[in-house]
């Protein structure tokens, strides 16, 4: 995971806090789902399409973390869930592990209103 985060930083997808990781999108505003990269840059959470070889593709969404509501981060035995709302749309992600520092950055930015 660290190599991928280093690549996200060096390629400019996320800032030097390294809050970037891949997850499975289970709910996005236009109905997309699948493998995405979540990258925090400043106070924005940018969502990028990612292929199965971890190649980052097009920018799908740019979300101002200061504008999100109903942030939920749940940790279970087998998986974690990240879910929030923005402008009336629900964003939901699962199938990510070992990203507690990145989730902490998301939570801090969301609470920094």
Identify the role of each PLM range.
Residues 108-113:
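Short acidic DE-rich linear segments
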Residues 28-37, 41-87:
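Phosphoinositide-binding peripheral membrane targeting modules
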Residues 2, 19, 82, 91-94:
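Short non-domain terminal segments
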Residues 88-105:
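Canonical phosphoinositide-binding patch of PH/PH-like domains
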Residues 1-42:
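Anionic N-terminal interaction surfaces
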Residues 3, 72-73, 88, 98:
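N-terminal functional modules and adjacent low-complexity/disordered segments of proteins
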